[in-house]
């Protein structure tokens, strides 16, 4: 059994802030935990514009705080987000998140991330194998 708190993760190598400071992700469960997924708490700043594309991962996102917009850049669709909203990027869609207020999201990635991935110039995380 693994038990962790976001308090103990804060300011460790599991606590990642984007280069532009727009978002912060606390990686609670990672690939090294060997459970087949990773689980993150991500906070995105109000008024920011954030473009992502997870070409190598499926991501499920559940919004627990805040409001804003999700723009599906592949299908030219826009969605309003509020607490209780969930979106699943099962088609590896390029997307943009535009918070009206600070958003706090709980995110699951499959395959799991290792924790040190950095978005490339296209917003993509590389697929990193977890060492045996």
UniProtKB/Swiss-Prot annotation:
<dbReference type="Pfam" id="PF06339">
    <property type="entry name" value="Ectoine_synth"/>
</dbReference>
<dbReference type="InterPro" id="IPR011051">
    <property type="entry name" value="RmlC_Cupin_sf"/>
</dbReference>
<comment type="pathway">
    <text>Amine and polyamine biosynthesis; ectoine biosynthesis; L-ectoine from L-aspartate 4-semialdehyde: step 3/3.</text>
</comment>
<dbReference type="GO" id="GO:0019491">
    <property type="term" value="P:ectoine biosynthetic process"/>
</dbReference>
<comment type="function">
    <text>Catalyzes the circularization of gamma-N-acetyl-alpha,gamma-diaminobutyric acid (ADABA) to ectoine (1,4,5,6-tetrahydro-2-methyl-4-pyrimidine carboxylic acid), which is an excellent osmoprotectant.</text>
</comment>
<dbReference type="InterPro" id="IPR014710">
    <property type="entry name" value="RmlC-like_jellyroll"/>
</dbReference>
<protein>
    <recommendedName>
        <fullName>L-ectoine synthase</fullName>
        <ecNumber>4.2.1.108</ecNumber>
    </recommendedName>
</protein>
<keyword id="KW-0456">Lyase</keyword>
<dbReference type="InterPro" id="IPR010462">
    <property type="entry name" value="Ectoine_synth"/>
</dbReference>
<dbReference type="GO" id="GO:0033990">
    <property type="term" value="F:ectoine synthase activity"/>
</dbReference>
<comment type="similarity">
    <text>Belongs to the ectoine synthase family.</text>
</comment>
């Amino acid at each position: 059994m693994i038990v962790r708190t976001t308090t103990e993760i804060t300011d460790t190598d599991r606590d990642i802030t984007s280069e532009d400071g727009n978002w912060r992700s606390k990686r609670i469960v990672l690939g090294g935990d060997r459970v087949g997924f990773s689980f993150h708490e991500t906070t995105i700043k109000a008024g920011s514009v954030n473009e992502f594309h997870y070409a190598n991962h499926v991501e499920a996102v559940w919004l627990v705080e805040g409001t804003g917009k999700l723009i599906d850049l592949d299908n030219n669709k826009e969605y309003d987000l509020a607490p209780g909203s969930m979106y699943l990027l099962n088609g590896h869609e390029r997307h943009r998140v535009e918070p009206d207020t600070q958003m706090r999201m709980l995110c699951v990635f499959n395959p799991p991330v290792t924790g040190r991935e950095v978005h490339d110039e296209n917003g993509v995380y590389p697929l990193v194998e977890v060492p045996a």
